Amino acid sequence: MTLFHHVVDRGAKKRGRNGEQRLFPLSSLLDGYECARRDEHISYGASAAAVPPFGCTFSSAHGQQNCLAVANEEGFVTIFNTGEKQSSVLKEWQAHDNAVFDIAWVPGTNCLVTASGDQTARLWDVITGDLLGTFKGHQCSLKSVAFYKQEKAVFSTGGRDGNIMIWDTRCSKKDGFYRQVKQISGAHMKPERFTPQTKKRRGMAPPVDSQQGVTVVLFCDETKLISSGAVDGIIKMWDLRRNYTAYHQNPLPLQAYPYPGSCTRKLGYSGLSLDYTGSRLFSNCTDDNIYMFNISGLKTTPVAVFSGHSNSSFYVKSTVSPDDQFLASGSSDHNVYIWKISDPKQAPMMLQGHSQEVTSVAWCPTDFTKIASCSDDNTVRIWRLNRKPEGENSTIQDGNLVGWTIRKVQSPNRTPGHHSPVELTPSKNPGSVRSVSLASPQPATCAPTGAALPLPSNTSSAPPAKLTSPKMPSSLQQWISRSSKSPVRKALTPVLQGLSFEHRVKRRLETGDSASSGLGEEIDGVSELYPNVKRSRSSVSTLKKEDSFGLESEKRLGSDGAEASGKENSSPRRTDWLSVISQKFKGSAQPKSPSSGSSQQDTRTLESPAAVSPRPMKVFSPPTNKKASPSKPMKKISSYFMKRTQD
């Protein structure tokens, strides 16, 4: 019996200071995993540049269980000897000209199979380095390769083309390559919501969709295969004794395990692993959860969920400890997580040290004290369990330690009645924001407040600004006047309190005249910069084509207003509107003639739509171009008829 089995069967014993022995559970040893600098290895490519490793796995051959095979992005395969205290490189060669995404040992032998992005799988002899065979048939990159633990000649591959292929090395080669003996096409294709209009042409290969890719294949026994897809969210079990090539539509699996999460869109799986009994399936989902299914029963819902890590890619894998008590998985937050399978809600242990996403993780099948991990920081690390007496520190010096273990601190659950304070985005720098003049001093209701804006995680919250209701000033002169300390601003049209504005959502406020006549005037910051365009629009909406006198007065008042605009930074309409109001108050104290009243009334109609009284107005006929002299009496209409009769 090995030391590992003795520890598992009898438990972990620690000797106290008084000499007595105490029995501890095996989970109490998890915090002893450490990675020394001598167990950190950099993965290199063809040009001696560091490249990320994609897959790692321990050998199952007798006497070779300490051999670790690692494949990287440049197609290189490296064999490490992890049996010694300092792991060393046994062999290294370039297996493919493209990336190797997965690797699998042939059970009980010194051979392994590599699945590459060059659409082929290759069988290698590790001792001699010879290529024993090439397997062709996929139309896209191969993402996964798997053997049954008691079968040496048959293995399976899954690719991005959505096909699952079964290979047998006992079959003869054709054109120098091995061909698949069984194929499951479209294993994880999403069902189409509509019928494709284009017809399939004879002799043309089917189009390849990246969303139908097969991410993982795994044997559960010699006749059943488990697979997962990228986006369909379904784990499927296939009976290899069936002929799936006869299906004209999507093939029907023996059993299907639908996505059990709460996400609205279906997600995919990046890794699948079985315990050593073959009854519990652990699936790494891209929703940051690991679901455990009991595949020996009839239920298709998970029996446990492991959470706490992060999974944002299809390279994160998981592995089960040789005693079936713990689950280890990579994570996108640069850590390796270890859960106790019998207690999924317990906080996991974190193996910290990597600086990028941890992808593949392998637990030595014959040594509980050894874990291998691959990361996007271009390193492969061997984590060893450093058993030390109680009360003593690690035997490895801090300078030589590149990885350590801590327990993840779970966030406390919120009480049902507790609500966190609303975080507000800090106010922006006024100098960096372009100033745009509004059509009214009142804020538009569609403008978002501070609570409605997104808050970055690295910014501090600011108190919300108090919104005060605008008040009408006592004097118009006081409203447009500003002090020396006040910022430069435009004199904008004040809104009458008696009018109701309901079209604020479009950031447009209507004046009284436009509201009554049905001709809305769009007032925004852009039109304020072009007073000539604004005057032309107002003249079109208020004047008639035959009113030549009104047009001349409009041009005259507009030119005067332009001069005032350059001095007081106000619009020409503002100066004309104020002058009309002043004339109104001046003229109210003295009697007015019909002609003067008509002129003032026309000026108000032309220049101040907002100041028009809601009561009906009298319409005056426009005066003629030649003014009648006051000494000459006006002719009667009857005199014209008399002349016409005399002629």
Curated annotation (Swiss-Prot):
One of its GO terms (cellular component) is nucleus. InterPro entries: G-protein_beta_WD-40_rep (IPR020472), WD-repeat_CDT2_adapter (IPR051865), WD40/YVTN_repeat-like_dom_sf (IPR015943), WD40_repeat_CS (IPR019775), WD40_repeat_dom_sf (IPR036322), WD40_rpt (IPR001680). Component of the DCX(DTL) E3 ubiquitin ligase complex, at least composed of cul4 (cul4a or cul4b), ddb1, dtl/cdt2 and rbx1. Residues 426-443, 471-486 have a biased composition (Polar residues). A motif (DDB1-binding motif) lies at residues 167-170, 238-241. Gene3D superfamilies: YVTN repeat-like/Quinoprotein amine dehydrogenase (2.130.10.10). The keyword RNA-binding does not apply. PANTHER family: DENTICLELESS PROTEIN HOMOLOG (PTHR22852:SF0), LETHAL 2 DENTICLELESS PROTEIN RETINOIC ACID-REGULATED NUCLEAR MATRIX-ASSOCIATED PROTEIN (PTHR22852). Residues 410-487, 534-647 are annotated as: Disordered. Residues 543-558 have a biased composition (Basic and acidic residues). SMART domains: WD40 (SM00320). GO terms for biological process: DNA damage response; DNA replication; mitotic G2 DNA damage checkpoint signaling; proteasome-mediated ubiquitin-dependent protein catabolic process; protein monoubiquitination; protein polyubiquitination; regulation of cell cycle; response to UV. Keywords: Biological rhythms, Chromosome, Cytoplasm, Cytoskeleton, DNA damage, DNA replication, Nucleus, Repeat, Ubl conjugation pathway, WD repeat. Belongs to the WD repeat cdt2 family. The keyword Repeat applies. It comes from Danio rerio (Zebrafish). Substrate-specific adapter of a DCX (DDB1-CUL4-X-box) E3 ubiquitin-protein ligase complex required for cell cycle control, DNA damage response and translesion DNA synthesis. The DCX(DTL) complex, also named CRL4(CDT2) complex, mediates the polyubiquitination and subsequent degradation of CDT1, CDKN1A/p21(CIP1), KMT5A and SDE2. CDT1 degradation in response to DNA damage is necessary to ensure proper cell cycle regulation of DNA replication. CDKN1A/p21(CIP1) degradation during S phase or following UV irradiation is essential to control replication licensing. It is found in: Nucleus; Cytoplasm, Cytoskeleton, Microtubule organizing center, Centrosome; Chromosome. Its main location: nucleus. This is Denticleless protein homolog. Residues 586-600 have a biased composition (Low complexity). Disruption phenotype: General developmental defects, including apoptosis in the central nervous system and a dorsally curved tail, which appear by 28 hpf. Effects are due to general cell cycle defects, including defects in the G2/M checkpoint. Pathway: Protein modification; protein ubiquitination. WD repeats lie at residues 48-88, 95-134, 137-177, 209-248, 264-303, 308-349, 353-393. The gene is dtl.
